[in-house]
Amino acid sequence: SDVYKRQVHVGMTNIPYQSDLEYLKGYSEDLGVPFVHYETFFDPSTDTRKSPCFLCSWNRRKALFTVAKEQGCNKIALGHHMDDILETLLMNITFQGAFSTMPPKLVMRKFEMTIIRPMCLVHEADLIEMARIRGFRKQIKDCPYESLSNRSNMKEVLYSLEKMNPEARYSLWKCMTNIQEELLPGMNEHDL
């Protein structure tokens, strides 16, 4: 099958979350990868049960699906790294009572799209160091909802866990595939 690469940037017109589009476009084109900029918006009052961060993320994801379909693509590679995945795991456990996170590969049949996360085993610190070495320009982040986000709190939790155990991130990663159902409440027919 053919591989079509695109660098897609989805902007939110109603949030002052800025990226240097010329820089991103230039970098992408230097690699021979076409750059697509797509703008959308969301109204945080449409669903007060969901956080603005969730609504923004979901609307950006839908926009990515739209662009992918328009470009004739059926696979989207996202830049989530190991820290993102572990922070999401901790958020879902803490706030949703669910043992779930962002998988490295997710087939979304409803959209006929597959999401992959090729950097899922890379530490955020390693990406920051690589960006520094390569001289990448830091992008502007000025989201009015960022201070309300639980993700920054979970980043601190992950850091605290690593202070207690330097291998904590690897233990968290391993626990996602090392579920001992017989030792969990509600998983055994004889429980409660």
Regions found by a protein language model. Give the residues of each.
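Short, solvent-exposed polar/charged micro-motifs at secondary-structure junctions
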Residues: T46-R49, N150-S152, E181-L184
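Alpha-helical elements of Rossmann-like donor-binding domains used by nucleotide-donor carbohydrate transfer enzymes
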Residues: Y23, A63, E156-V157, S171
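Generic structural signal for well-ordered, non-membrane alpha-helical segments
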Residues: Y4, Y17, S57, S147-N150, ...
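Catalytic subdomain that performs nucleotidyl-dependent activation
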Residues: K75, D83-K163
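Short, solvent-exposed coil/turn elements at secondary-structure transition points
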Residues: G11, F41-D43, M108, L121, ...
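ATP-dependent adenylation/nucleotidyltransferase module used to activate substrates
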Residues: S1-L90, F95, A125-I133
